């Protein structure tokens, strides 16, 4: 893993105290930084000749509220980016936590990597993470009037409203969810009675 050791040393040298944590697992490095340092770190990751992460491949939101079966005691929302350096042929995962769990806000890195445009919109749509400085932060996958953020752990599985076609009105209508919650108990089939005949 000389390549990872080289990357780790370069990150520690260039970023210094901005490195909140650097985790090596399954042959990959994850860099964790504070929200206040996020934009500056992103620029350094892209522009420093010893790092040169030219491409942001993906960004997703994460809700850690139920992480480790509720044992997680850190901040709730994070943005996780996957970065690629074509120059040095290495990858990095960059994680930043929003400092406020009630209203998660992070700076947008769209002026560093413009490929993040729709990724930040998706994280806003699904998790409610607001990216300050994003030029067009609006929903991208849910409906215009959608209430809430469906990938949050506290969002109900059945949702709040359902959409259906009403043949009388000849249009799509929204109405409160009519699904009744039920408990599903698995049916146990004993081996001796499998298939309906006794063996």
From Swiss-Prot:
One function term, GO molecular function aspect: NADH:ubiquinone reductase (non-electrogenic) activity
Keyword NAD belongs to the record: yes
Gene source species: Cupriavidus metallidurans (strain ATCC 43123 / DSM 2839 / NBRC 102507 / CH34)
Keyword NAD: yes
Location(s) in or outside the cell: Cell inner membrane
InterPro entries linked: NADH_DH_suC (IPR010218), NADH_quin_OxRdtase_su_C/D-like (IPR037232), NADH_UbQ_OxRdtase_30kDa_su (IPR001268), NADH_UbQ_OxRdtase_CS (IPR020396)
PROSITE patterns, sorted: COMPLEX1_30K (PS00542)
Main location (coarse class): membrane
Description of how the protein assembles with itself and partners: NDH-1 is composed of 14 different subunits. Subunits NuoB, C, D, E, F, and G constitute the peripheral sector of the complex.
Protein name: NADH-quinone oxidoreductase subunit C
